[in-house]
């Protein structure tokens, strides 16, 4: 793991909560407080383009998906997959502060049978043989 990970901070404006890393105003992710499962940022919406290759009306098929997310951000993708798709999800995040802040401030659910959060370097997770079919 990296020796020095950036600090995590939050800001909020006009009903949108933002996640920042380090001492910068740059946004890593966000959540509309009144719609915590909605995907707010355009670039995060584009990350869901893979759904174009799936029949989104087939709920059973979506619930059989297992998504892997390398980096948590503000947990937008994770919450969307859990809430809207009902899929199983594995998230790999190197910064334990990001995980803690997402639980406290961004409505990230606690891990369960459908939702796993691994605090580790994503490179090591990808290289692990047991994750080959995820």
For each feature predicted by the language model, list its residue ranges:
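Rossmann-like AdoMet
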Residues: 1-58, 82-84
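The AdoMet/dcAdoMet-binding core of the Class I SAM-like
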Residues: 36-134
């Amino acid at each position: 793991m990296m020796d020095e990970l950036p600090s995590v901070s939050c800001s909020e404006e006009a009903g949108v909560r933002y996640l920042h890393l380090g001492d910068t105003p740059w946004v890593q992710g966000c959540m509309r407080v009144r719609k915590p499962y909605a995907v707010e940022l355009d670039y995060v919406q584009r990350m869901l383009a893979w759904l174009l290759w799936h029949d989104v009306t087939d709920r059973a098929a979506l619930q059989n998906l297992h998504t892997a997310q390398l980096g948590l951000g503000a947990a937008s993708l994770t919450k969307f997959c859990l809430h809207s798709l009902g899929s199983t999800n594995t998230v790999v995040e190197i910064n334990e502060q990001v995980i803690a802040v997402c639980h406290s401030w961004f409505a990230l659910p606690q891990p369960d049978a459908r939702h796993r959060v691994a605090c580790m370097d994503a490179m090591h997770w990808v290289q692990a043989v047991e994750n080959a079919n995820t």
